[in-house]
């Protein structure tokens, strides 16, 4: 389960965030808990100051209650967030979300490699396709990159055009997808799951 802390009313107070992580840990039990703070630049609901973004990541990792932390690898605080995750032995999902379009397949593959070089344990990219060719480019980049990747990849195209990437991404090398409980997903095109 992913918890999007950028959507939490108490997000300005790291103590409240850590307390909520504790409550969520109790609710999800042994199921993996992913901690995410998505900034507006990458489709989130909030723009924390750089130090606050880092503090939220560091404190969530220090809590000992999360299983994976999502770090936007292009965020100015990314390297310090990675250091905090490593200090607490929390695996890192490096992510990049492009709501403006879909880069060429070679650029997608380059971004995925950059995330692996950054130190990610899992690399994730989400793009916004304009047409079927964009969807095909994402799938091509995934299938090409997975051949030489040292880490698992999660790739998806958002919106209605991208549905095929969420439902059949594993055929091309994506190791996971994101869905939603209920109607309100955190990104366009997330498939609803039964409760």
Question: Residues of each region from the PLM?
Answer:
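Structural preference for beta-strand elements that scaffold enzyme active sites
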Residues: 2, 30-36, 66-70, 89-93, ...
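Catalytic beta/alpha-barrel core
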Residues: 2-8, 53, 61-77, 93-103, ...
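Active-site-adjacent beta->alpha loops and helix N-cap segments on the catalytic face
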Residues: 8-26, 72-88, 103-107, 130-145
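Generic structural signal for hydrophobic
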Residues: 24, 60-61, 85, 114-118, ...
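Glycine/small-residue-rich loop that forms an oxyanion/phosphate-binding "nest" at active or ligand-binding sites
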Residues: 33-71
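Short, acidic/polar
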Residues: 48-59, 104-114, 164
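Histidine/lysine/aspartate-rich catalytic loop segments that bind and position anionic ligands
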Residues: 84-121
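C-terminal alpha-helical cap/extension of soluble enzyme domains
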Residues: 143-195
């Amino acid at each position: 389960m992913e918890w999007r802390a950028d959507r939490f009313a108490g997000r300005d107070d790291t103590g409240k965030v850590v307390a909520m992580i504790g409550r969520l840990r109790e609710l999800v039990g042994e199921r993996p808990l992913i901690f995410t703070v998505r900034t507006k630049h990458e489709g989130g609901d909030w723009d924390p100051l750089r130090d606050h973004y880092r503090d939220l990541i560091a404190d969530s990792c220090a809590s000992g209650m999360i299983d994976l932390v999502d770090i936007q690898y292009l965020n100015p605080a990314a390297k310090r967030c990675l250091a905090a995750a490593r200090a607490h032995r929390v695996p890192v999902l490096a992510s990049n979300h492009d709501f403006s379009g879909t880069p060429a397949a070679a650029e997608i593959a380059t971004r995925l490699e950059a995330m692996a070089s950054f130190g990610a344990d899992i690399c994730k990219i989400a793009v916004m396709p304009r047409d079927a060719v964009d969807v095909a480019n994402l799938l091509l980049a995934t299938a090409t990159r997975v051949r030489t990747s040292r880490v698992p990849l999660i790739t998806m195209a958002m919106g209605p055009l991208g549905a095929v990437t969420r439902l059949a991404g594993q055929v091309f090398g994506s190791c996971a997808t994101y869905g939603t409980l209920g109607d309100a997903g955190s990104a366009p095109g997330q498939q609803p799951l039964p409760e």
